Amino acid sequence: GVYDAFGLLRQDKTIMAHAIYLSDEEKSLLGNKGVYLAHCAQSNANLTSGIMPLRRNLEQGLTCTIASDVAAGHTPAMNKQIALTIEISKLHALQHDTEKALTIGEGLYLATKGPGRFYGRTGSFETGYAFDALVIHMDDMEGLERTPFEKLQQFIYDGDDRNIIARYVDGELVVRG
């Protein structure tokens, strides 16, 4: 392809946004080069440019991530990008019986540890990784106790910056409240 001919597909050092209409040959090339495919669901929806076959790409071994593209999207908030990616994957799965929708866990991975590998050891709370984190507070609903996962799920679908009480980058508190 053109990108490869001009040396733009550096091994494990390239992120390609959108990647909606890739041929099998292009997928093979991008996979062999370790290119990260940045799925910008909100941007694609706003532009009505198409739906990335995310599940199929993942099953074919391509490295995919969830990203925001505020040039055509309307928020950089990653929780909203995760939610919309999952919703669109459900619609895509309805039209393609052989594909299943993304889960919350997969969406979270594709927005954290998955793309974090591009930058090194980030995107996870594992030992040896940079501590990049949001401290999130989600009020319990009246008398209803929820697990941490249920609270995270609520933040992904219903939370916003008012629920973030602290931000850490590489172990340093950068914003409180």
Spans of model-derived segments:
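Conserved beta-strand positions that form and line the central face of beta-propeller blades
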Residues: 15, 124, 154
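A structural signal for short secondary-structure junctions
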Residues: 10, 30-32, 58-59, 126-130, ...
